[in-house]
Amino acid sequence: MNQLCVERSPNISTATAYIKGKPKKSIERIKKKKDSNKSIKSQHKFEGSKISNKNNELKDVKSKDPKNYESYLNKNTKHKDILLKSKRSDNFKFSRRGFILSFTGNLEDFYNLSEEPLGKGTYGCVYKATDKLLKIQRAVKVVSKKKLKNIPRFRQEIDIMKNLDHPNVIKLLETFEDEEQIYLIMDLCTGGELFDKIIKKGSFVEMYASFIMKQIFSVLNYLHIRNICHRDIKPENFLFYDKSTESLIKIIDFGLAAYFNDIDYEMKTKAGTPYYVAPQVLTGCYDYKCDLWSAGVLFYIILCGYPPFYGESDHEILSMVKKGKYNFKGKEWNNISDEAKDLIKRCLTIDSGKRINASEALKHPWFKKKKGSFNLDVKMDIHVLENFKNYALLLKLQKLAMTIIAQQSNDYDLQQLKAVFLYLDEDGKGNITKNQLKKGLENSGLKLPQNFDVLLDQIDSDGSGRIDYTEFLAAALDRKHLSKKLIYCAFRVFDVDNDGEITTAELAHVTFFVILFLHHVNDFPRLENCTKYIDLNA
């Protein structure tokens, strides 16, 4: 049975327990009696209200969901807990977000930073960093707290990055914090900025432009489905993962990104870069389609080499943007297809209500004509199906470890799986349906086992109904990629105090937070101050 409990320290009279899909329950601390090392099933059910009685015992406690949950009283030398045990063994779900841990202390105990920064920003610099033990190279964004005008706003940037899981989004791996700085440890991209490539080449042929723009519209579709507006789409904020011709691009810098709600899309903060900013942003009342305007400007630039709106100063540029007038008159446009020009027009529509959205852009005839790829071999072989089967048989703790390994793996080792995932993601939502995966396997000539639907449920580790990028990688990852370095990465996530050993409490630390993040619980103690115990054998 799955088991979740919350420790109450001696100076706290109440604690919070969490049940999957249910609101938090307040429980009064049960005072210690005799210490024991065993867990005893109580004679009563969990009520969810404060527990109080003369004998300090668990009495008259009822379950809110008696069909699925029982309550237990746990006693040992350090604490006493209410245990919430699920009667079902198949509902243990977890999210990769919970593995992106935050640490306090000296970053240089773990990483060697390059002397020269890779890039500079308003609040800090990005350096190349090398893991001292594993020799893995990462990128570290170093942000000065003194220069940050709004630290909560910066923490929202971190929160947004933790929630994103897409092949075209820069991957946040962990964070550090000391008294003066905040450090974001991310994937290292070595291929340079999209901006630099535009400067070097001048313009792109349509086939390559379609390869780039499909990725941009796909990642915008992914963000907008999750009610996130980037608000600073420009070529400087896209990096090539490596220097290869077919390298994917990664969107970076979520410093201006913001959440919007389903009822009122409007945002009011003026944000963006003059060449790429949408007219509505200048008025201080705009919606998520400001990103589509910016994408349209970027699209225009990569086809001809210069922006649609220009001037000698920011004031002149913004004046041109407000008018929204541009043309395709230069000789550079002579050989550009009408379909490409039409897609640009749909992005650069002044009326945001009539402006195309990212999902519609992906279905535009231009992509069908150009196919938007380099004919990558995306067929899955029998080994992928076998890896799925093997993953489904793993213990829950092993699945947690495989998810960490998939997240920590660099894209060099995952090129084929990444191409397969993007191919299967037909609607550009950044995740795939179970039917899309089945169709892809069948189209590759593979015979599916009779219990394949059950197997798919095992791959969908967060229970969302769709298979996310890291979920797919964790299940499809070939065991030959399980290097000692990656295995140690998984070990280090669980080894909270970095003493080279993993205790039951440390396993519970990580697993508890993975569960909390899955259910979007924000009201919980700091990691270093709480100990959670979970039935890890379940």
From Swiss-Prot:
Domain Protein kinase: residue ranges: 112-367
Subcellular location, record wording: Cytoplasm
CDD domains xref list: EFh, STKc_CAMK
Enzyme Commission no: 2.7.11.1
Sequence motif J domain EF-hand interaction motif, residues: 396-405
SUPFAM superfamilies, per database record: EF-hand (SSF47473), Protein kinase-like (PK-like) (SSF56112)
GO molecular function, one term: protein serine/threonine kinase activity
GO biological process terms on file: cell differentiation
Regulation of this protein's activity per its record: Activated by calcium. Upon calcium binding to the EF-hand domain 2, the C-terminus of the junction domain (J domain) undergoes a conformational change which results in the dissociation of the pseudo-substrate inhibitory motif from the catalytic domain. This, in turn, may facilitate the autophosphorylation of the activation loop at Thr-273, which leads to the kinase activation.
Segments forming domain EF-hand: 412-447, 450-481, 482-517
Tagged with keyword rRNA processing: no
TM region(s), chain numbering: none
Positions bound to Ca(2+) 2: 495, 497, 499, 501, 506
Motif (J domain autoinhibitory motif): 387-395
Protein purpose: Calcium-dependent protein kinase which acts as a sensor and effector of intracellular Ca(2+) levels probably in part downstream of cGMP-activated PKG kinase. In the mosquito midgut, regulates the gliding motility of the ookinete which is essential for the ookinete to invade the midgut epithelium. However, another study showed that while required for ookinete invasion of the midgut epithelium, is not required for ookinete gliding motility.
The name this protein goes by in its record: Calcium-dependent protein kinase 3
Taxonomic lineage: Eukaryota, Sar, Alveolata, Apicomplexa, Aconoidasida
